[in-house]
């Protein structure tokens, strides 16, 4: 029963992956060259915090930023003033400028604390310029933060749910400068990039496009790039691109792969994974540390001090691992059942999969993240 619960996540994945490959729209498989988002970043201040902001004595850049901002607003602070503020926090503001964004359009921003602020809940981001990689300002951000976490502390005890040092402002930035996008190459052709390189999928996309248009308007350059003969007129080109995006194509099934997350112990298999017949023996190794500090209490009339003497017992136990047969499995469900039969924990399973791969019994690419 425990083994079944342990593999519940993998079984759910199997249910999703067991069905045959279905046709997908080209817009879900590829994107046109030049149609991309651009990263923006800015530095600003969040005010209005309820005593949960930066400790300005430990984060001097917060106080320096506040002084500079006040001077721009006509407020001068005497030199040497030691401002003890807890309602202000220095933050980094990030956003993604969508393609074809026009002046005046709004976009969401993410606000993250830079200093030692406890929480940004209830704060307001002051006007912050957002710059691109070229240093130009493309948007201005300002607004009230939406924080998904909550925390409280009192008398040395604290509790926190989710993260309180970062939040979002829906529609918190306004586009001030547009990014010029050029659709197509100088020779009039238009490039289409597959999200994942695959020669079979590229061939199927080309065949679907040429079949729909009734002429060879598409040609595959390699496993990712498809070159299109697009109309020169802008309106006709948009119609051409929209027509291509809505065509259905059945993508090629990807290679067999096993993903292992060494930090969390998660193991994920896709539907192409198969096993060859092999024998597996794996012994579980457990280390137990039992710490029982002892208090040494001297005689009340003697000259001595009460001290705590550490006392720890360490034991190592290894369970014997008998050889177990793993039969040939050509179906993903058979693979899951064969691995479940070993009764191994996720951490042990990672070692078993690596050994099966080395022995040539695991017919899949093993990727550790």
Swiss-Prot record:
InterPro entries: Flag_FlgI. It is found in: Periplasm; Bacterial flagellum basal body. GO terms for molecular function: structural molecule activity. Keywords: Bacterial flagellum, Periplasm, Signal. GO terms for cellular component: bacterial-type flagellum basal body, distal rod, P ring; outer membrane-bounded periplasmic space. GO terms for biological process: bacterial-type flagellum-dependent cell motility. Its main location: periplasm. Residues 1-23 form the signal peptide. Transmembrane segments: none annotated. It holds the Pfam family FlgI. The basal body constitutes a major portion of the flagellar organelle and consists of four rings (L,P,S, and M) mounted on a central rod. Belongs to the FlgI family. Assembles around the rod to form the L-ring and probably protects the motor/basal body from shearing forces during rotation. This is Flagellar P-ring protein. It comes from Chromohalobacter salexigens (strain ATCC BAA-138 / DSM 3043 / CIP 106854 / NCIMB 13768 / 1H11).
